């Protein structure tokens, strides 16, 4: 609050509620945390595009996007856009997984490395926490070709799964999806 020069009078909470209601942000509580620790995520597609690729750019080439196809800036944008499209289509993802009828809460999750517990830092794009005591761990990867899970990436996914299990102490079945 102090960084944004807001008074501690509830006005900032009202602004966040308004932004969420209008679809500019979403809030979620990370599994294992209190509601007071909610995370707010900017989800408005144009606003994200503007801050990432337009603001503070000195580009006046009308063919800019055509000329960036295959370049890192374009690939980065495709990855970010794909992740947001997935987050906007959770009902369709649930349908493809065959769990449309299962009550599900969803969120992202992250943790810092913890040497004491022997876990690496991890971030999970999407968790589908299902009423049937299963949690789908979803990683969203954009690829212009068929995405192949390498041995190294498989190891990384298993590390994330282990970090999640250790930090949250969940007893639910964990499915990497």
Predicted segment positions?
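Short amphipathic alpha-helical interaction segments
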Residues: 5-22
